[in-house]
Amino acid sequence: MVTEVSLIEIAKTTRQAAQKSAVLSTEAKNQAIEAVAQALEKATPKIITANQLDCRIAETDGIAKPLYNRLKMDEAKLNSAIEGLRNVATLRDPIGVVQIHRELDAGLILKRITCPLGVIGVVFEARPDAVIQISALAIKSGNGVILKGGKEATNSCLELVTAIRQGLSTTSVNPDGVQLLTTREETLELLKLDEYVDLIIPRGSNSFVKFVQENTQIPVLGHAEGICHVYVDKFADIQKAVKITIDAKTQYPAACNAAETLLVHTDVAAKFLSEVFPELEKRQVELRGDRATQQILSSVKEATDLDWATEYSDLVLSVKVVDSLDSAIAHINNYGSGHTDAIITEDGKAAEIFLAQIGSAGVFHNCSTRFSDGFRYGFGAEVGISTQKMPPRGPVGLEGLVTYKYQIVGDGHIAATYSGENAKPFTHQDF
């Protein structure tokens, strides 16, 4: 009960801080972001040391390789996160944007204007860099944020949030707008605070995200899986296809936008697979193929139905030979997770059909699935990826942390004037 009460107080404090941030100028918020960046740079040795401790403990506990890769934060990864933080300051302020400005009648003016959501709860496995990304977006969008990292990242998150709050202490943004929880019990209680928390963003494994979705009444923004596909069409440029496949699978295999299944048209299967296989083998990628693939690459393990529905997050790639574009589309729409899928082809009509018929949040032509990322989209950073059909969808940056309200300003106007036998008509003129 003590934990529940204290967490409610934390949520209330976060909301109070967020209410003040909601009215800050763009300049004040950008100054706060720069102060945080400088504080993180100053705290780099402490952050790296804390992360090394987390990594040693995680190795002792036998953490899975994909989680370990997400947990590890060297100086280059930290500097990249700080760069992303600063990029958020250069983005357009999403708050106070007038989406509708309309005269309903003389002296009766309607506006629809963007505003912060309020308090966001973010729960994540490993991924200490998520602390920096999400804090930056929360500051810029005038929201408060309650962060809960996995136990494997506890020391890293503590140092990161300490530095962030230290940076904010010299600015107009109240440090109480960024809070950190550290126990599993607090996670469960956070999911129950629908009265105080406006949005939950989970970042982690399939089972983790599903657990969050099934245990809260708070709206959830997230995706459970990242089963991404690359389809090499019969009209593909083979060299492009090899280069893109290597990048999509190996550039960062633990990422949710890494390719997990490779589909190859039967007309180019022998040529393409014979060229891409040595490159994948050189990078220690394990292939699991259907029988048609095994006839071309005899050393490849046999794929099962489970492979087509698996997010490996590792150097494993399932391969299937298909007889048509329609077959590739059907496979992706059946087994895919709605994250990101790509077609490699020089046939514009085939690309057009693929882009239209694949139902994923990201559908690409002649480029790697790894481009499905908020930073690469120019969002500055992302709070997560959403594969749901309703917006926000795909990599979610500032726009996913903003809602809107309707404001009407009148001068003694009453609704009765516009109803009944002698009702006055509305003018409905947009400014």
UniProtKB/Swiss-Prot annotation:
A GO molecular-function annotation: NADP binding
Compartment(s): Cytoplasm
Keywords: Amino-acid biosynthesis, Cytoplasm, NADP, Oxidoreductase, Proline biosynthesis
Top-level taxonomic group: Bacteria
Pathway(s) of this molecule: Amino-acid biosynthesis; L-proline biosynthesis; L-glutamate 5-semialdehyde from L-glutamate: step 2/2
Gene Ontology annotations of biological process type: L-proline biosynthetic process
Broad enzyme group: oxidoreductase
Record's keyword annotation contains Cell membrane: no
Pfam families (alphabetical): Aldedh (PF00171)
Catalytic activity, reaction form: L-glutamate 5-semialdehyde + phosphate + NADP(+) = L-glutamyl 5-phosphate + NADPH + H(+)
InterPro entries, A to Z: Ald_DH/histidinol_DH (IPR016161), Ald_DH_C (IPR016163), Ald_DH_N (IPR016162), Aldehyde_DH_dom (IPR015590), G-glutamylP_reductase_CS (IPR020593), Glu-5-SA_DH (IPR012134), GPR_dom (IPR000965)
GO cellular component, one term: cytoplasm
UniProt-listed Enzyme Commission number(s): 1.2.1.41
Family label: Belongs to the gamma-glutamyl phosphate reductase family.
Role noted for this protein: Catalyzes the NADPH-dependent reduction of L-glutamate 5-phosphate into L-glutamate 5-semialdehyde and phosphate. The product spontaneously undergoes cyclization to form 1-pyrroline-5-carboxylate.
Name of this protein: Gamma-glutamyl phosphate reductase
Gene: proA
